[in-house]
């Protein structure tokens, strides 16, 4: 492990986009620490990928999640990028309240718990670096939100709403970092509908491959993009549906 290697922590790394991003970062020379709830999958990834050097079981809904993140950062020997991919959601046309609340707990409370822990760690390091002669590239936070946060989706109320919350929260943290003159950049990743467990069995259109999405994500992170919609078809779609008036949108059948 050398100082030339950049270090990334990936939460939600046991499946889907998070797993593919962790693998790709390792292939591109990053030293990667991974986190998630399923220890067996974490260990399997660590043993099969040279660049994935440590892992930690973290449930983002647990109050001890921030302390576990700090433990993982210590095991990795630092952190340059925090990548947040932990999230849940359901199609919920019958409005099962338990599903709605679980989604808020993970995508809302869990998201804030982890992103704030990473931001505060970076803020402390950024302040320390101001007092030294050594320069450091911008610390980075990158999070998977969704195009589902750009318009209300009646088939997935809590998921769509929490993704909207996440995007706004990241915008707030971006502004706060600049207000406090912190060396932190933030990337809001907004994929379209990706073929993962999250939308298994759904009829959402234009479903994307997780490996292809991961490649676009890593490029966006390494270029320091502030917002990245994946892919170009969804960027066009989001632009077009932003033009639809609310009274028209709420009468449309978006997915069932």
Per-range role (PLM):
Residues 49-64:
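Rossmann-fold cofactor-recognition segment
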Residues 85-91:
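Conserved NAD(P)H cofactor-binding loop of Rossmann-fold oxidoreductase domains
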Residues 92-105:
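Short alpha-helical oligomerization interface
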Residues 188, 200-238:
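C-terminal helical subdomain
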């Amino acid at each position: 492990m050398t100082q030339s290697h950049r270090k990334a922590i990936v939460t939600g790394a046991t499946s889907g986009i998070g797993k593919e991003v962790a693998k790709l970062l390792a292939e591109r020379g990053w030293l990667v620490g991974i986190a998630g709830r399923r220890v067996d999958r974490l260990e399997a990834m660590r043993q099969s990928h040279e660049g994935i050097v440590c892992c930690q079981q973290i449930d983002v809904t647990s109050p001890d999640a921030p302390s576990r993140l700090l433990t993982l950062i210590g095991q990795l020997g630092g952190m340059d990028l925090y990548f947040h991919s932990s999230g849940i959601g359901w199609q919920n046309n019958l409005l099962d309240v338990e599903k709605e609340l679980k989604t808020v707990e993970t995508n809302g409370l869990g998201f804030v718990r982890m992103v704030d822990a990473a931001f505060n760690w970076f803020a402390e390091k950024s302040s320390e670096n101001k007092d030294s002669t050594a320069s450091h590239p911008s610390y980075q936070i990158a999070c998977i939100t969704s195009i589902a946060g750009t318009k209300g989706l009646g088939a997935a109320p809590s998921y769509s709403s929490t993704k909207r919350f996440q995007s706004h929260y990241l915008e707030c943290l971006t502004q706060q970092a600049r207000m406090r003159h912190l060396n932190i950049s933030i990337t809001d990743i907004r994929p379209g509908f990706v073929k993962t467990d999250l939308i298994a069995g759904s009829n959402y259109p234009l479903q994307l491959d997780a490996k292809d999405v991961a490649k676009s994500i890593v490029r966006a992170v390494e270029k320091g993009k502030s917002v990245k919609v994946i892919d170009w078809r969804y960027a066009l779609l989001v632009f077009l549906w932003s033009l639809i008036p609310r009274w028209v949108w709420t009468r449309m059948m978006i997915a069932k």
